[in-house]
Amino acid sequence: MADVEPTIHHMGDFLRAENAAGRPWLPASHNILRAFTIPFDSIKVLIVGQDPYPTPGHPVGLSFCVAPNVHPLPKSLVNIYKELVDDLGVPMPTNGDLTPWTERGVMLLNRCLTVGVGRPNSHQGKGWEEVTEAAIRALNARTDADGKPQPLVAILWGRNAQSLEPLLTNAFIIKSPHPSPLSASRGFFGSKPFSRANQALVTMGADPVDWTL
C-alpha cells in the first residue's frame, strides 16, 4: 500500500478542506481505514460496497455494517440478512454489527471510504478508488509458500462492485444485483452468496466461514 500513501495524504487534505467549507463527512476519522485493520493474510472473502452510509451514526468503516445500537437497520442490510437466513438457515441477526465476519476472514471494503453527510456518492472520484483498488490488487496477488494464489472469494453486488472483476483474476467471483430495495428482487434474493462462498473456499482447500451473527 506504500505506493498509494501520497493519495491517502491527498485525501486527508481533501477532507480537511471539506470540513473548512462546512461540508461534514462520514465515518469518523478513526474509522476511515478500519477495513484494513484485519490481518491481510487472514482474508478469505472480500465483500465490496460502494460508499459509506450518508446518515450520521450509521457508517463505521466496514461496508454494509452499522453500530450495534442502530435501529432500524439500513434497508440493504435488512435484505442481506434475509438472504443470509434463507441461504444458510441461521438465526436472524439482532443488530447490524458485522464485525464478527471480519474476525473470521471477511473483508468489508467500500470502494470509496468517505461520504458527505446526507450526500450519497459525493466523494466518488476524489481519490479513494485508487487506494481501494490497490488493496484489491494486493489481495489478488497473495501467494502461499508454493507460489500458488491464496484462496479468495469476491462477492460483488451491483454494477459498481462488479466493475472490479478484472482486478480479481485469482479469486472465485460471486456476483448478483445489489441488495438495495431497488434491485434486490432482480436476482439478489435467491443468489445464495454465503453458501456458494463456503463451497468455493472448501474446493480451494480453505476452511468455510461461519456466517452466524
From Swiss-Prot:
Catalytic reactions on record: Hydrolyzes single-stranded DNA or mismatched double-stranded DNA and polynucleotides, releasing free uracil
* Xref: InterPro entries: UDG_fam1, Ura-DNA_Glyclase_AS, Uracil-DNA_glycosylase-like, Uracil-DNA_glycosylase-like_sf
> Which keywords are on file for this protein?
Cytoplasm, DNA damage, DNA repair, Hydrolase
Q: Which domain of life is it from?
A: Bacteria
Is Transcription tagged as a keyword?
Answer: no
Q: Which GO terms describe its biological process?
A: base-excision repair, AP site formation via deaminated base removal
* UniProt EC number: 3.2.2.27
Q: Per its record, what are the GO molecular function terms?
A: uracil DNA N-glycosylase activity
- Name the residues annotated as catalytic in the UniProt entry: 51 (proton acceptor)
Principal EC category: hydrolase
Q: Where in the cell is it found?
A: Cytoplasm
One GO CC annotation:
cytoplasm
Family per similarity comment: Belongs to the uracil-DNA glycosylase (UDG) superfamily. UNG family.
State what this protein does: Excises uracil residues from the DNA which can arise as a result of misincorporation of dUMP residues by DNA polymerase or due to deamination of cytosine.
Give the HAMAP family listed for this entry. UDG (MF_00148)
In its UniProt entry, what is this protein called?
Uracil-DNA glycosylase
